[in-house]
């Protein structure tokens, strides 16, 4: 007999993560073993929050995720400022939309994920406009990989 909590959590399938950018929402997802994060892509902000949320819900369902991790942009001191409060509001709205599908929604500290994603892209030679288009999904991937490594 092995530890039940871990197995039941892993049995819930893949995990998706989002990075809530001002222009784009970056999305990443895990493999079914919950060990490796990959970028899914981005949802361009439409100016309609509900439409954007529904696009995220569609992506999470496409990824067959049982859990969604929403990046929480805490300040450097760990405090929840306006951006973090907005992310918490988005988290609650997504929880209401994804709950009927059995998807758990939680938050994770996303400090430095964008910086780390940008650093990785520069190291790979991706800069400028092309890099800006994928930085949000790369940041979501960094967030998710960190979450997976801690789980």
Go through each PLM region and give its residues.
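Phosphate- and other anionic-substrate recognition elements at nucleic-acid/protein interfaces
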Residues: 1-16, 23-151
């Amino acid at each position: 007999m092995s530890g039940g909590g871990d197995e039941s959590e892993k049995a819930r399938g893949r995990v998706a993560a989002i990075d809530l950018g001002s222009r784009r929402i970056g999305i990443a997802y895990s493999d079914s073993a919950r060990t490796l994060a990959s970028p899914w892509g981005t949802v361009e902000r439409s100016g309609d929050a509900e439409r954007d949320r529904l696009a995220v819900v569609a992506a999470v369902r496409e990824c067959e995720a049982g859990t969604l991790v929403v990046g929480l942009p805490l300040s450097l001191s760990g405090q929840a400022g306006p951006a973090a409060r907005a992310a918490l509001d988005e988290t609650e709205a997504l929880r209401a939309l994804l709950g009927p599908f059995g998807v758990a929604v939680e938050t994770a500290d996303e400090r430095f994920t964008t910086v780390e994603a940008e650093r990785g892209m520069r190291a790979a030679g991706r800069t400028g406009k092309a890099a800006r288009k994928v930085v949000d999904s790369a940041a979501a991937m960094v967030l998710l990989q960190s979450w997976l490594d801690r789980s």
